[in-house]
Design a protein with these regions (language model features):
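Extended acidic, Ser/Thr- and Pro-enriched interaction/regulatory segments
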Residues: 82-189, 193-471
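Generic detector of low-complexity/intrinsically disordered segments
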Residues: 7, 13-16, 26, 35, ...
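Low-complexity RS/RG/RGG-rich segments used by eukaryotic RNA-binding proteins and nuclear co-regulators
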Residues: 67-85
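Structural signal for hydrophobic/aromatic residues that build the beta-strand cores
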Residues: 5-7, 23, 33-35, 47, ...
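Functionally constrained cores in energy, signaling, and assembly domains
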Residues: 10, 14, 18, 55, ...
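Canonical RRM/RBD RNA-binding surface and closely related RRM-like beta-sheet modules
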Residues: 3-5, 10-58, 62, 66-71
Length: 471
């Protein structure tokens, strides 16, 4: 059976001693191959191989094939590799890589799920165990109740309430979306090069579900201001976002690969409503994926339920996720936590009989689906016939008709790079964001309030203008 290998520098690894020393380990199965473009942007690619000779041949073929003919510094022949000055090549690659700066993040968010959560039977969600963050959340709840009162909080969108900055994540909402798409170059390229429509649908479903486990942070991202932007490069995907509406918070986005063969685009509407002791978060809008040979898809993420603003804190995905094949009229339907205990049943028991991260689903015809525009409570019509069955756990794996397509241990996440032409409107240039990243909480709160007052003033000016110009 073939393995997938990640290699850090594209030419160095072909030196036999380096290959044996750094790659041929018994448990080493996954990795990223970074190739440097002429324009010096790192690009990550994956090669499936049987042995070293097979790997070398495939590497040369892929390095020189027509897909990349205009992209690389030079073409390679096998003879050239044998005579390569490894140390010189290592220095050259290192100098190129130094020109691209990884965007620094507070955490490796993909590791939070393993470090701070406990996944057990008989619960409706994963138990959050970070006591420091739990105390911080409790302090935020007390602050909110003191400011607004319990009755005023219930049913409100948490995104419309001015929260204290000590609850904030060191990312904007736009950065969060980009971070969740770190697997997109890998899974979308798998889908793009698949000839079978169901195979494409599988890989886009993997993209949808592989985002879940890296999104379990409990801190609140910065709400972007109208006109605020974020740009980055994720593998071969150039990604751009702009905040276009304040209420409800809406971000328009566009992403395109270097070869312009894959693009993603649309808009996302965010909302998070506070209940008695929980928070229900959802994204609606339109998220499209388009391939240059005419295939078009739409994805919808499941909702998130945070229980225990006070007391034991649980995190889980609920309702359903979707991938719609708009070209071939198929759908991939995912039902999250299918054994969830409902409100009525909770009066008699607080235990469910499966792990809360479990999901089931199926491929079906598009007209067998009841699609909900404004929430994630999509359903299958009665007597819907499954074409392919889906099962798995969002913290761990996904299977299609019993074949594993994704495992968290093998998840392919790409580095997010800064681009060299960041707009002045980039959210990371906000003063409150800058102060929070520096750890100056009081100053960050002060700057946040200044920006909020400016937004209120701008909103008043717009309202006054509309009133004045009524026909």
């Amino acid at each position: 059976m073939s393995d997938t290998l990640i290699i850090k520098n594209p030419l160095i690894f072909l030196n036999e001693s380096y290959f044996k020393k750094n790659v041929l380990k018994d448990d080493y199965k996954e990795g990223i191959l970074n190739i440097i473009y002429k324009n010096e942007i790192p690009y990550e690619i994956f090669i499936t191989f049987k042995d070293k000779n097979d790997l070398c041949e495939k590497f040369i073929k892929q390095y020189n094939n027509n897909f990349f003919e205009d992209e690389f510094d030079y073409k390679l022949e096998i003879e050239e590799i044998k005579d390569l000055d490894i140390e010189k090549e290592k220095e050259r690659v290192s100098l190129l890589e130094e020109k691209y700066v990884k965007i620094p993040y507070q955490y490796e968010y993909e590791k939070i799920i393993f470090k701070d959560y406990e996944n057990t039977l008989y619960k409706n969600g994963l138990i959050y165990k970070d006591e420091k963050e739990i105390r911080k959340i409790a302090d935020g709840a007390k602050w909110l109740i003191k400011k607004l009162g319990t009755n005023l909080i219930q049913g409100k969108s948490v995104l419309r309430i001015s929260l204290p900055v000590f609850l904030f994540d060191k990312r904007t909402l736009q950065e969060v979306l980009a971070y969740e798409l770190r697997g997109a170059p890998y899974y979308l390229n798998h889908a793009y090069y698949s000839k079978n429509p169901f195979e494409r649908l599988k890989w886009i479903t993997v993209l949808l579900m592989s985002q879940c486990y890296i999104s379990t942070f409990q801190t609140k991202p910065f709400n972007p201001i109208i006109g605020e932007t974020f740009q980055c490069k994720i593998g071969d995907l150039n990604f751009y976002l702009e905040q276009t509406v304040n209420h409800p918070i809406t971000a328009n986005f566009y992403g395109i690969t270097d070869k312009k063969n894959i693009k993603i685009y649309g808009y996302i509407i965010y909302d998070a409503t506070i209940g008695i002791n929980n928070c229900y978060a959802i994204r609606t809008g339109k998220f499209f994926i388009e391939f240059d040979y005419g295939q078009k898809y739409q994805i919808r993420t499941p909702a998130v339920l945070l229980q225990g603003i006070v007391g034991e804190r649980l995190y889980n995905y609920i309702d359903s996720g979707l991938v719609l094949d708009l070209t071939n009229n198929y759908a991939s339907y995912i039902k999250m936590n299918p054994d969830e205990i409902g409100y009525f049943k909770s009066f008699f028991t607080n235990k469910q009989n499966s792990f809360p991260d479990r999901f089931i689903g199926q491929f079906c015809k598009l007209n067998d689906l009841i699609y909900k525009e404004d929430d994630a409570k999509h359903e299958l019509k009665k007597n819907s016939t499954p074409i392919i069955k889906i099962e798995g756990a969002w913290t761990r794996d996904i299977y299609f008709d019993g074949d594993e397509y994704w495992n968290v241990d093998d998840n392919q996440l790409f580095t997010i790079y800064e681009v060299g032409y960041v707009l002045p409107s980039d959210g990371r240039k906000r003063e409150d964001y800058i102060q929070l990243v520096k750890g100056n909480i009081e100053k960050a709160q002060e700057e946040k309030e200044k920006l909020e007052n400016l937004q209120r003033y701008d909103r008043k000016l717009r309202a006054d203008y509309l009133e004045k110009n009524k026909k």
